[in-house]
Amino acid sequence: MVVVLRPWSLDDAAALFVASRSNPDLATQFPDVGLDDEEQARAHIRGALRFDERAKNWAIVEDGVAVGNVGLSAIEFLHATAWAHYWLAADARGRGLATRALTSVSTWAFDAGLFRLELGHRSNNPASCRVAATAGFRAEGVERQKLRYGSERFDVETHARLATDPVPDLPGFEVRTTS
């Protein structure tokens, strides 16, 4: 298994389309987005999965196929902070890919000059909580009823990792900034 992290390419549209359909829980990762075909997947890559000054999204590529995303958004250097996020296709879960990807991108972010990375997950998502904790993100609190999907509201547990926090003892992935 060869895994690299690299910016999304329009060539990843088919993989994104397949991943988006792999598990119903991924619908929350694509709010207000129609991913009904590869053209819509390409539009999503061009827009939401961009790689620029304020947002950096890396495809988690396993053996040449994009199986997930790890990213930073709301990047700002005045306070040296960013918001981290991740998702995996259903068949890529349970093997530590998200944890190692998040750890690798966190190292990249701290090397780039950021100091604090934050993330949040629904409190009913223990797998995402394990990813965050194993990647060195400490729980900081619960934001009550923060998210709404359909008619249901969800609490969000917030985590953060500082550049001064201990580095998790995990093998990293290669982090590329060009496709």
Region spans (language model):
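Generic alpha-helical scaffold signal
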Residues: 10, 35-39, 54, 78
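Acyl-donor (CoA/ACP) binding surface of acyl/acetyltransferases
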Residues: 1-15, 19-24, 59-179
